[in-house]
Amino acid sequence: MRRLILLIIVVTGIFVNYSLAQVDSHFSLFEYSQNVYNPGAAGSNDAMCVTSLHRQQWVGWDEGRPQTTIFSFDMPVVDVLGVGLNIYQDIIGFQQDLDISANVAYRIELDPGILGIGVGVGVINRAIDGNWRTWQSLNGGTVYQDPAIPHMESKIAFDMNFGATLVGEDFWIGISTTHLLRPTINFEVGLPSYIARHYYLSGGYNYALPNPSFDLVGSGMVLSDGSTVEFQINAKLLYNKSFWGGVSYRYDDAIVPMIGVHLINGLSFGYSYDIVTSKVGSYNSGSHELMVRYCFNLQGGKTPGRYRSVRRL
């Protein structure tokens, strides 16, 4: 029964989105995926940083559950420019998306902080394998292929993102748009689909507590595809600029405990676990997310774990 419910949800979501839109996958540790959805963040760490994020959503459902992986690289190249490269893979049901994009940001020093205005260009490869697993196929029979659904097709479309990020000593704020040109995917079978523009507003603030060993870090993000709105807020307690733990709330979806550490050699690790509060929560055991980041200070060796900017938390 759970597999049947999952199949209905996944297939309905995919093929309604065929002719309409697709919401970008969300990350609970969204602070570490900014380069993917906001090209203005390229180079904002003032270091060469390599970041990987992996999300396993709705663990406990055997087939069709979303799985998302991000690889991101960014660095400042001169005082006024930052560059980045992103590889993003999203798998859900029959559909697999692979996005590759390059970012460049122009950085302007202002009184409050450094403003980065960036553009990202790349390609989206969308593949569909519309094979239906029926009880006959699981018992040695033929896999059913619906003639109205693309089968073993893959198409590529050009994509563009735009964004701006302002980073200060104790705060950061960003605004961006992804899929600016609304790329269209035309398979040989079925209706043409387009990927809707997505709009992001995100920010964070580091509040120094009376005890100098502790900081309270708050952040939030609002995401909309023009028809739906999703928002998330995070609160973390940072100890000695190195160890942190906290909780996040994503409206009508999940409560998310999270932990992490910034090591002295430039390595950072983070983990979060989504306790799903929506109706699908009864059919899974939550979602897991893992982050690994390595930053290298181009001017003086490895970036220390004790960062001075909230952007690097």
Q: What is the role of each PLM region?
A:
Residues 22-313:
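Subset of outer-membrane beta-barrel
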Residues 1-4, 110:
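Positively charged n-region of N-terminal signal peptides that target proteins for export
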Residues 4-15:
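Sec-dependent N-terminal signal peptides
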